[in-house]
């Protein structure tokens, strides 16, 4: 042996004793494996062809060898830092490093070698560094090469570095845990033509390991699996690769769990020749572009991704699936913001007829988002399935390239199931099935066969711009499902479903409400089917009606396969029973009349009997003078409810407070009947001024009132009223009284209702009102305490208007109005004297009230609605006033009122006055 190439040891001397040699010999003869410590804490440096740092040959015998704290450096041609060729040997390498820098690849026989090579036996490396620093070519830069059925490697908490990365083939088994593979990536197997068909599969397991392939390494993929070999990844990151993050070809099986696959910051290499693939423009107006990098590249192989993340930057694809690819994505996410989430057909290397079926499944909540969800490069049969709550975003498109000779062509089928959701458009899908899932259609689309089941739905996406309606054209429609659609009433446009050949099944249409008014009732066509089709359509909106602008609409068929929205009639009011009358007697013949001039045609009026939409009904019932006046009168009412009985305790003035609650039932003849509950309080103080024959009480007041409305089946609203005012009350010694008030109010009105599509519509505005009242009466008292008191009252109220736009776009203008209310009443009661100067005065009262005006106008989208509460109602009440002595007074009352337009089933008042 040439001494210049002899081994140089720069550490403790070798401890190979005679006993150790004897034990090794016994092991070779079949004795129990012995542990060797031949290379612990050594520095091994070799320079020379095939001068290996540690070489365990088959002739060395079985056993476990250890190399702890050892450093190995080799630099000769085909010199390997560690070479294992003994199937019965195991090398445990811990807390050390192995480095090689010589040429390792043997081009003559295409043989791979690595810094560490395991051809037979087992390598256990822990906290180690295996580095190939060769800079000649990637095949020379293999850090770890494990090949052969009897070869095994178990790596933990280590770093493996080299332009050729880690290579495993020919039935070897490798496990890598919590480690880092840098520069050249991981490569399992070889291309199918280069490996024998009867070779057993290699198996590699990565756990929480990072794999990186930098552009300088030339590695086409950070991780590649060729042939019938298997890779399992549980946690970790895969980064880089000239063309792909993970490549699986020719029968490979790859399981990726909790893995993250990214290209990293390196620029893309390996761009597709010729640039963008022609044809197949996305419906939105763009064509998919490629930059040649794929997160996962699959052909004739099976890849399962579970809770993993795949990101393709620039214009790449998260997954490229060639012929025979079977890809399942469970949870996790696929992202290609500027490119394709999935590209099919482009990864095929050969086209043997027929091509194997290609399937991609997203399930278990997987998320996929890109410019295109699926881009079919070649017309191969493709089946895309989204299930189990998976969500895909992006169009489904295909090139218009003709089939390649020798390649099979087939349909592009898409299945959505189990609460999956796809958001995008397509003109490329041959068949689409939606079973308990949703397709959100973002643009005009064409589908061959569409079948829906189990509440499957097609959602015509609500456009960002009004008027950008969408059309879905299908050859055939079957099953039973839901279509969510939009209308643009003011433009006379709507989304449309067009069936070209055959339509069957029972389907529902859910139409989003619109606040705009339709240009014409004849333009809201939603569905067109061939004449005589068996398909039926019904509205899924509440009560089978759609709120559009001011009115509600229903769905009707014209018998020619067209289904359109037409105006819905308001429910008819009950008709009174006819009364018998006298029978007319014979009438003399009438002389002929001269021709009369025909009157001019009246101006167009709002359609009669139409049912208001929820928003329009709420706006009409919130506006006008009727609602505001009922609040104002609840705050005002009679003197006795405000001040109590001033006659019980003549004073020089006082302070008082009262609370009240009332239920109102209103029918203003424009909106639907509704209920309102009113509650509030009022505080005031006055000063008494004695005059001849009586006294005046001059004072001021302020209060707050809240009205809570309920619109049956729709929602409700509120009014918050704050008011201030003054009053002057004259109490005469003769029993006559006069009470005058003046009050100003600020009213904050709002409503929130649910439209027929289930979405909330809100509206609010502010208005102001002012009113005055004058009440007079006289008490006729009897000696035993009984009294009779006729009363008369006149109140005038004026409320301003306001303009606003509801949340759904409905334009509302409240023009305000006036109310003039008169009341005639009679009160009967008894004054009862109690001990200590206290008094109580129970009473009953009956009144008749007449509203002389009470009319106002509310406009919705320019359509006028006349509201009015004019009419008569009766009122009954009872109450009690009590003087408790020392200036304290209490009073309370209950009332019931009934009229054709306004009823108050109950009204309660309670108050307290302190006199000084």
Curated annotation (Swiss-Prot):
CDD domains: PL1_Passenger_AT. Residues 648-916 form the Autotransporter domain. Residues 571-607 have a biased composition (Pro residues). InterPro entries: Autotransporte_beta, Autotransporte_beta_dom_sf, Autotransporter_adhesion, Autotransporter_pectin_lyase_C, OM_autotransptr_brl_dom, Pectin_lyase_fold/virulence, Pertactin, Pertactin_central. Pfam families: Autotransporter, Pertactin. It comes from the Bacteria. Agglutinogen that binds to eukaryotic cells; a process mediated by the R-G-D sequence. Pertactin may have a role in bacterial adhesion, and thus play a role in virulence. May contribute to the disease state of whooping cough. The signal peptide, cleaved at the inner membrane, guides the autotransporter protein to the periplasmic space. Then, insertion of the C-terminal translocator domain in the outer membrane forms a hydrophilic pore for the translocation of the passenger domain to the bacterial cell surface, with subsequent cleavage. This is Pertactin autotransporter. It comes from Bordetella bronchiseptica (strain ATCC BAA-588 / NCTC 13252 / RB50).
């Amino acid at each position: 042996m040439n001494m210049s190439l002899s081994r140089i040891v720069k550490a403790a001397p070798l401890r190979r004793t005679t006993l150790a040699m004897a034990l090794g010999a016994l092991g070779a003869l079949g004795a129990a494996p012995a542990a060797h410590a031949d290379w612990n804490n050594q520095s091994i440096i070799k320079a020379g062809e095939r001068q290996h740092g540690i070489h365990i040959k088959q002739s060395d015998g079985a056993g476990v060898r250890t190399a702890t704290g050892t450093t190995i450096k080799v630099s000769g041609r085909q010199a390997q830092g560690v070479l294992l060729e003994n199937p019965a040997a195991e090398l445990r390498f811990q807390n050390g490093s192995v480095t090689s820098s010589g040429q390792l690849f043997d081009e003559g026989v295409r043989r791979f070698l690595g810094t560490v090579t395991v051809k037979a036996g087992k390598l256990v490396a822990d906290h180690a560094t295996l580095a190939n620093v060769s800079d000649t070519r990637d095949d020379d830069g293999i850090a770890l090469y494990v090949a052969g059925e009897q070869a095994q490697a178990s790596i933990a908490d280590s770093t493996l570095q080299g332009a050729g990365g880690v290579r495993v083939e020919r039935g070897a088994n490798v496990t890598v845990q919590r480690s880092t593979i840098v520069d050249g990536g991981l490569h399992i197997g070889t291309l199918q033509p280069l490996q024998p068909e009867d070779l057993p599969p290699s198996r590699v397991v990565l756990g929480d390991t990072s794999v990186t392939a930098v552009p300088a390494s030339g590695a086409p993929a950070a991780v590649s699996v060729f042939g019938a070999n298997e890779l399992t990844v549980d946690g970790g990151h895969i980064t880089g690769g000239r063309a792909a993050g993970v490549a699986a070809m020719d029968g490979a099986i790859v399981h990726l769990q909790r893995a993250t696959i990214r290209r990293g910051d390196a620029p893309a290499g390996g761009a597709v020749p010729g640039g963008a693939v022609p044809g197949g423009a996305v419906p939105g107006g763009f064509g998919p572009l490629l930059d040649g990098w794929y997160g996962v590249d699959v052909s004739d192989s099976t890849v399962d991704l579970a809770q993993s993340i795949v990101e393709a930057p620039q214009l790449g694809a998260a997954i490229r699936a060639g012929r025979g690819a079977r890809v399942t994505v469970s949870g996790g996410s696929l992202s290609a913001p500027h490119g394709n989430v999935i590209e099919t057909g482009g990864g095929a290397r050969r086209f043997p007829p027929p091509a194997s079926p290609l399937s991609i499944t997203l399930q278990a909540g997987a998320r996929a988002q890109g410019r295109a969800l699926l881009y079919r490069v070649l017309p191969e049969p493709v089946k895309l399935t989204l299930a189990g709550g998976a969500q895909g975003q992006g169009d489904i498109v295909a090139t218009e390239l003709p089939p390649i000779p020798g390649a099979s062509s087939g349909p592009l089928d898409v299945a959505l199931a189990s609460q999956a959701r796809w958001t995008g458009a397509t003109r490329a899908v041959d068949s689409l099935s939606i079973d308990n899932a949703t397709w959100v259609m973002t643009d005009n689309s064409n589908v061959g066969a569409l079948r829906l089941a189990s509440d499957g739905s097609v959602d015509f996406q609500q456009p960002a711009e009004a008027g950008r309606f969408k059309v879905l054209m299908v050859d055939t429609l079957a099953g039973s499902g839901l279509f969510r659609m939009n209308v643009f009433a003011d433009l006379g446009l709507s989304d449309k479903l067009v069936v070209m050949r055959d339509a069957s099944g029972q389907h529902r249409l859910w139409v989003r409400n619109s606040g705009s008014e339709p240009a014409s009732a004849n333009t809201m066509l939603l569905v067109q089917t061939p004449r005589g089709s068996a398909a039926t359509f019904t509205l899924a909106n509440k009560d089978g009606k759609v709120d559009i602008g001011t009115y509600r609409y229903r769905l009707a068929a014209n018998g020619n396969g067209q289904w359109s929205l037409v105006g819905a009639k308001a429910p008819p009011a009950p008709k009174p029973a006819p009364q018998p009358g006298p029978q007319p007697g014979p009438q003399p013949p009438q002389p002929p009349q001269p021709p009369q001039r025909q009157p001019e045609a009246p101006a167009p009026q709002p359609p009669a009997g139409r049912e208001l939409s929820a928003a329009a009904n709420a706006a009409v019932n919130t506006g006008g003078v009727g609602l505001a006046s009922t609040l104002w009168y609840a705050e005002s009412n009679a003197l006795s409810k405000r001040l109590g009985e001033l006659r019980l305790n003549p004073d020089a003035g006082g302070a008082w407070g009262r609370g009240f609650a009332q239920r109102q039932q209103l029918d203003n003849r424009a909106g639907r009947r509704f209920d309102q509950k009113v509650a509030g309080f009022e505080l005031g103080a006055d000063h008494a001024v004695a005059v001849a024959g009586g006294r005046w009480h001059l004072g001021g007041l302020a209060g707050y009132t809240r009205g809570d409305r309920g619109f049956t089946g729709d929602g409700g609203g509120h009014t918050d009223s704050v008011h201030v005012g003054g009053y002057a009350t004259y109490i005469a010694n003769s029993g006559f009284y006069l009470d005058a008030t003046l009050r100003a109010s600020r009213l904050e009105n709002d409503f929130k209702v649910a439209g027929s599509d289930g979405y909330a519509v809100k509206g609010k505005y502010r208005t102001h009102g002012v009113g005055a009242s004058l009440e007079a009466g006289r008490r006729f008292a009897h000696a035993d305490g009984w009294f009779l008191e006729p009363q008369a009252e006149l109140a005038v109220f004026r409320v301003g208007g306001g303009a606003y736009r509801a949340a759904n776009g409905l334009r509302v203008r409240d023009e305000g109005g006036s109310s003039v209310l008169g009341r005639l009443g009679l009160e009967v009661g008894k004054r009862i004297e109690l001990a200590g100067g206290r008094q109580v005065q129970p009473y009953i009262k009956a009144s008749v009230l007449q509203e002389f005006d009470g009319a106002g106008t509310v406009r919705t989208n320019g359509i006028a609605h006349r509201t009015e509460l004019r009419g008569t109602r009766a009122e009954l009440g009872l109450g009690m006033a009590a003087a408790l002595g020392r200036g304290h007074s209490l009073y309370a009352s209950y009332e019931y009122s009934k009229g054709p337009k306004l009823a108050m089933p109950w009204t309660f008042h309670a108050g307290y006055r302190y006199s000084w």
